[in-house]
Amino acid sequence: MKPKKLGIIGGSLLAFGILICAIAFPPFLRSQVKKQIALKDGSEMRELWSNFPVPLDFKIYLFNVTNPMEITAGEKPILEEVGPFFYDEYKQKVDLVDREEDDSLEYNLKATWFFNPSRSEGLTGEEELIVPHVLILSMIKLTLEQQPAAMGILNKAVDNIFKKPESVFVRAKAREILFDGLPVDCTGKDFASSAICSVLKEKDDALIADGPGRYLFSLFGPKNGTVLPERIRVLRGIKNYKDVGKVTEVNGKTKLDIWGEGDCNEFNGTDSTIFAPLLTEQDDIVSFAPDICRSMGARFDSYTKVKGINTYHYKADLGDMSSHPEEKCFCPSPDSCLTKNLMDLTKCVGAPLIASLPHLLGAEEKYLKMVDGLHPNEEEHGIAMDFEPMTATPLSAHKRLQFNLYLHKVAKFKLMKNFPECLFPIFWVEEGILLGDEFVKKLKTVFKTISIVGFMKWFTIVSGTCVSGAAAALFFKNKDKNKLDITKVTPQKGEEKKWPNQMTISTIQSAAVPPNLDAD
């Protein structure tokens, strides 16, 4: 092949590799990712975001109390973890309304749980456990803080409403504690019962009606299959992909009015179900969590691989409001801040619950020593997630949270006169996902395309360089062949200069000498 043609081929390959594969394709790919992430009405992403077809893994672990009477007498609590009670959790966003003026949409959240015995490791929900009666203890705690003079009334009301309990612990089946409910009898006509029940009825989201004047109390029952009242407004990300999913309002308010001064009331991050793509190691994963009335951030920790896909591993915790100035607004009061990885939720949920990581992971040692049976472990009890950085797809995520009550001696309540002081764990939950093979396959298809383009880039660049080099070499080789070689003939001494045999002028210059010298 002629050098010129080889040069054209080599240059074309080189130009294709550099201009198309190396320069044009990456921006095109990024633009497509940005476009696909937007929550545009009718798009595939909008459908997945609003009604994810695959359930989340929802695991509940209860702490069984093995020495309830001894605790009542003042001894240290001994606990035994029982779980997981595994539930398939379906989350739907309902009553969606688009707001074109600011590229946002509003929705309510609906969560539904279905018990999955095949993944509950032999547990059925029929197991009888002894646990703190959260409703009784919450009533005691709130009365002490808000109306301590009413403790006498509360004593009488507890006897009537809960049928003269022997302790603040209750023996019940796991399914009753979690979803089916424990009985609350508000049929009494006495003043004490009527007064306390009127307060309980105001919190209708915590009780399920079970006939006239009768209710059922459980940890999750009232929320199961129910559209939650919070109206959440998020950005769609059509105008700016970085804004996708960001929370801007809850119930028409642009910030909370729960916490003290500072940024604690601000809505930071997304609604935790979608995140902006093209992550870097410097980006935090920030989301607003309505169940604890605050935003939380997860930070890059390491590079990982999930199901054959390269991911970024992130970790999160509850912070330390006692030592971090920007978190002090989460303190119940300026002089009553909890320490690291503990958060008082009283203002948020209306019950004196304290959030922590499971088994008090990362909390001060003194709280761990208040009870027996806790064994914190980072891998099993930490908050962690793995994101594919280009699409911000969570391939694996584990959100874990424990709920506790701070208990102590209450002289004016007969069942707690000798109670030990302790941070008492009640239960902990893990909400997680390991992305299914169907969705992983789609991701791998994208990365296979990227790999093919990457291969084409280097193949065309290397091939183009080699072909261009070969063309240049061939060109110079042919150039050398076309040179006229002149050999100098030097006659030896005494020899007569002669032309070679049969050589004439015409044979030397046949192409240069015209056949007819008189042609002109």
From Swiss-Prot:
GO molecular-function term, one example from the UniProt record:
scavenger receptor activity
Compartments annotated for it: namely: Cell membrane
Residues linked to a glycan: N64, N224, N268
Q: Name one GO biological process term.
A: sensory perception of smell
Q: Write out the transmembrane intervals.
A: 6-26, 452-472
Tell me the keywords, alphabetical order: Cell membrane, Disulfide bond, Glycoprotein, Membrane, Olfaction, Receptor, Sensory transduction, Transmembrane, Transmembrane helix
> What stretch or stretches form a coiled coil here?
none
Q: How does it sit in the membrane?
A: Multi-pass membrane protein
- Sorted alphabetically, which InterPro entries does this protein's record hold? CD36_fam (IPR002159)
The cellular component terms of Gene Ontology attached to this UniProt record, alphabetical and capped at eight, are:
cytoplasm; plasma membrane
Mapped to this chain, the residue ranges on the Cytoplasmic side of the membrane are: 1-5, 473-520
Q: Does the keyword Chaperone apply?
A: no
Which stretches face the Extracellular side?
Answer: 27-451
All disulfide bonds of the chain are C264-C329, C293-C348, C331-C337
So what does this one do? Plays an olfactory role that is not restricted to pheromone sensitivity.
Family under the similarity heading: Belongs to the CD36 family.
- Supply the name of the protein: Sensory neuron membrane protein 1
Lineage, top ranks:
Eukaryota, Metazoa, Ecdysozoa, Arthropoda, Hexapoda
